[in-house]
């Protein structure tokens, strides 16, 4: 009998399903089992292109949520910054990788992140999530390099130090 409870079973099942169906299955599995955590959502959704995210959403099948991954996430995740990040990814509003880089926009993002991360107070996570989740990988690399130049700190480490609960996500 085939089971998906073992790591091998999960890998075999994912390979059999194919790239987007397996991601939809993982996105569907996270809330059904206690042993699965937010990592499944992160691995299956975050950082994907809009096209890939749309394909994963199209492959999501769960009658309880009328085949809507957005409804599933809204109902199953607690109302916190992680849900905001996942919902932003599901909105398919991420910059495309082939979009030309805008130096002024990158400088503006670095300044906004600097305002959030370099002040002593907490807060600003929602704005930070909005920036990071919706930018392309190329944009994020340029932003991280400029952040290092301006603030002489690693952007990822600054985010972890500022918002430990977001860094886990």
Name each region found by the language model.
Residues 1-169:
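Structural signature for extended repeat/solenoid scaffolds and their inter-repeat hinge/linker regions
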């Amino acid at each position: 009998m085939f089971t998906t409870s073992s790591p091998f079973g999960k890998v075999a099942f994912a390979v059999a399903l194919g790239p987007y169906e397996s991601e939809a299955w993982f996105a569907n599995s996270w809330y059904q089992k206690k042993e699965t955590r937010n990592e499944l959502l992160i691995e299956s959704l975050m950082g994907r292109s809009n096209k890939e995210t749309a394909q994963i959403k199209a492959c999501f099948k769960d009658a309880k949520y009328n085949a809507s991954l957005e409804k599933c996430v809204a109902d199953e995740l607690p109302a916190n910054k992680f849900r905001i990040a996942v919902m932003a990814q599901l909105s398919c509003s991420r910059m495309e990788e082939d979009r030309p880089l805008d130096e002024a926009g990158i400088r503006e993002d670095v300044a906004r992140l600097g305002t959030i991360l370099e002040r002593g107070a907490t807060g600003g996570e929602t704005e930070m999530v909005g920036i990071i989740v919706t930018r392309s990988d190329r944009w994020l690399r340029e932003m991280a390099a400029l952040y290092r130049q301006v603030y002489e700190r690693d952007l990822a480490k600054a985010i972890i130090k500022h918002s430990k609960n977001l860094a886990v996500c």
